[in-house]
């Protein structure tokens, strides 16, 4: 179970809607992923498609909870206004907060992010904060009262995987709120590693929506997250510099040398 604030989800995979080539394919991928929570960028999404059904209506039909985000915002003020708009339009106080430093790297502006999160928490929002892989920033966000910290594995859309696994593991070991890896996942093994490092969940969009076969990739991500979670719970063996035999040498037969 994934517990965030006052909600519980069976799935540890959160899927984003960005990059989907069609709403029909997005729907198939959402179902295949098993996700119960999905992000929608308030500034970018076309509310109604040619099929006549809005993405919001589709998510309600699929019984998938909606997580609006502040993608594209460059300042704390923009993020706060976007979150307030989402609350009025969608009747939810949940928001994924993104404040981007520049359009080339899409890396978080942690100064503006901290300001935005503090204001939104004070305004009654349940905040999930997209941040860098810096453990200190993650701690500061937790001090602000966010419901989850969402460190990046690598820059958005790069598919480079987890570039600094040590920092992700450190964030997980220190956090008292859920840690959800967000951004940079390229394939199933990246999602598995995130869970093995101690993450409570994985959020991804491009890895599925821009894959050659999005539905097949969604299925693989479902199994990858579950495999990583089970491995983390099981506990890996220690890494060693020298070999350790799996079978004991005790009890081996002792053969006397025969003289010919």
UniProtKB/Swiss-Prot annotation:
Catalytic activity: [ThiS sulfur-carrier protein]-C-terminal-Gly-aminoethanethioate + 2-iminoacetate + 1-deoxy-D-xylulose 5-phosphate = [ThiS sulfur-carrier protein]-C-terminal Gly-Gly + 2-[(2R,5Z)-2-carboxy-4-methylthiazol-5(2H)-ylidene]ethyl phosphate + 2 H2O + H(+)
Coiled-coil regions, chain positions: none
Pfam families on file: ThiG
UniProt xrefs under CDD domains: ThiG
Top-rank EC class of the record's enzyme: transferase
Any GO BP annotation: thiamine diphosphate biosynthetic process
EC number in record: 2.8.1.10
Alphabetized UniProt keyword annotations: Cytoplasm, Schiff base, Thiamine biosynthesis, Transferase
A single MF term (Gene Ontology): thiazole synthase activity
Active site residues according to the UniProt entry: 96
Functional pathway: Cofactor biosynthesis; thiamine diphosphate biosynthesis
UniProt-annotated location(s): Cytoplasm
Record has Nuclease as a keyword: no
Binding positions for 1-deoxy-D-xylulose 5-phosphate per the UniProt entry: 157, 183-184, 205-206
HAMAP family, per the entry: ThiG (MF_00443)
Function statement: Catalyzes the rearrangement of 1-deoxy-D-xylulose 5-phosphate (DXP) to produce the thiazole phosphate moiety of thiamine. Sulfur is provided by the thiocarboxylate moiety of the carrier protein ThiS. In vitro, sulfur can be provided by H(2)S.
Family designation: Belongs to the ThiG family.
Name of the protein: Thiazole synthase
Gene from which this protein is expressed: thiG
